[in-house]
C-alpha cells in the first residue's frame, strides 16, 4: 500500500468501536530498494513504538488506561502508518474488554498481522507509571561543536573517517536530527545515538551529515536506515549501531534501532523532548 492512500493528511473520522481494519501497512521494500537493499538486510534491529493515549472500557463500562510499547522487528515486511495506528488505538476507547491481558492479546494479534511479523507488546498500568524512565541518550554530544553548514538534504560525502589510524570505539549523540513526513510535510524532531568500532569518524562531518536531513522527507524508520548505511559505506566501521528517538505526535513516539552486531536492546527511556 502506498502512503498516499493512508489516512495521513485527510479529514479524520474517529471510529466509535474497536476496528482492526484501521491499521494501514506500508511495505518496507520500496524505501529499502532506494537505498540499494535488494536481498539480505545489512542490519537487524527493532522499531520501538510507545503509545500514550490508549484507553478502553472494562466489562462494567469503567474506562481503563495504559501506556503501550510495541517492538516491531526490522525484518518485518511492513511498517504501520502512524496516523492509522493512532486511529486504531483510538477505536478501543468505547469498546469493552474483560482484562488487561485481553487488550494486550488483541493489540499483539492485530499489529503483528499488519506488520507481517510477530510484534511484542507491553502494557504499563497507572500504578506502575512511576517506574517509567526518562533519560537522555548516552554518549559524547556532537552538538557541542561550533560549525558552519548550509547542506539540508542528506549528503553522505560529508562523512569521513581516519582509515589509516588505529580503530576506536565511540558513542556519539545529537539532538539536531530533523526529517519530514513524506505525505504531510510535517517536521519530525529527533535525537540520534551512533555507536561504532572502527576508524575514527570525523565529528564535524558527522554532525553536518545529521543536520543535512533537515529538509529530507522520509518516515522515521527509513531515515535511520539511510543514516546507518551511509555511515557504514563511507566510514567502514567494524561494528555500527544507530538508535533514534523521535518526539511524540498523536500520542505516539517512534524509536528505530539498527545494528550489525549482537548487543542488548537499547533502553526504552523517554528523552526530555518526548
UniProtKB/Swiss-Prot annotation:
The keyword Amino-acid biosynthesis does not apply. InterPro entries: GTP-CH-I_C/QueF, NADPH_dep_7-cyano-7-deazaG_red, QueF, QueF_N, QueF_type2. It comes from Burkholderia ambifaria (strain ATCC BAA-244 / DSM 16087 / CCUG 44356 / LMG 19182 / AMMD). It comes from the Bacteria. HAMAP family: QueF_type2 (MF_00817). Homodimer. Pathway: tRNA modification; tRNA-queuosine biosynthesis. This is NADPH-dependent 7-cyano-7-deazaguanine reductase. One of its GO terms (molecular function) is preQ1 synthase activity.
